[in-house]
């Protein structure tokens, strides 16, 4: 089967048609909020390309890239990489709360923590410490960005979320400046 696929790819390439396989690893947020639209346009333009997608946390995707299990990785953060690397976007993290809680001191209502990778957790913890909020214990720990947004939307607390997920959020958002 692999030889048959390679032969077909060679024939198509000899006819100047773009084909083959691309093994793409994408961070969860990019895969959820941006990749479907991009992937649709790509596969419409290059229907002979077999696109294989793996999603996960950036650290895991970087390991897959190092083991040649994926060809390209769209990841958050900086990793020691000797080959081609390109910054494709940059986005802030945001403090989010419901409109009813806007302007209220953050110490007066619950902080909603979100499970994320260790690098981002460390950045969030540094921001909390720099703003005298390190002593705050999350009242909830949530795995899902969408669940965090809903908790915040209903006024159950405030959270720190990436801008990428906030297009449909109708509450208060404030860009945060964090060490990178």
What are the residue ranges of the model-derived segments?
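Central regulatory/effector-binding core of bacterial HTH transcription factors
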Residues: 19-80
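Secondary-structure junction motif
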Residues: 110-134
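Beta-alpha-beta core module
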Residues: 82-87, 91, 150-180
């Amino acid at each position: 089967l692999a030889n048959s696929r390679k032969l077909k790819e060679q024939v198509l390439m000899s006819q100047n048609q773009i084909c083959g396989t691309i093994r793409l690893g994408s961070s969860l947020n990019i895969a959820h909020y941006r990749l479907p639209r991009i992937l649709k346009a790509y596969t419409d333009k290059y229907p002979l390309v077999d696109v294989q997608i793996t999603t996960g946390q950036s650290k895991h995707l970087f390991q897959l890239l190092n083991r040649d299990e994926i060809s390209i990785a769209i990841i958050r953060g900086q990793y020691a990489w000797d080959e081609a690397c390109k910054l494709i976007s940059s986005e802030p993290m945001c403090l989010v709360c419901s409109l009813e809680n806007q302007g209220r001191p953050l110490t007066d209502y619950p902080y909603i923590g979100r499970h994320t990778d260790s690098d981002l957790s460390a950045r969030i913890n540094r921001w909390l410490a720099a703003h005298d909020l390190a002593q705050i214990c999350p009242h909830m720990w949530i795995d899902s960005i969408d669940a965090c947004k809903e908790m915040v939307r209903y006024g159950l607390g405030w959270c720190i979320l990436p801008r990428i997920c906030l297009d449909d959020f109708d509450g208060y958002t404030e860009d945060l400046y964090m060490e990178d």
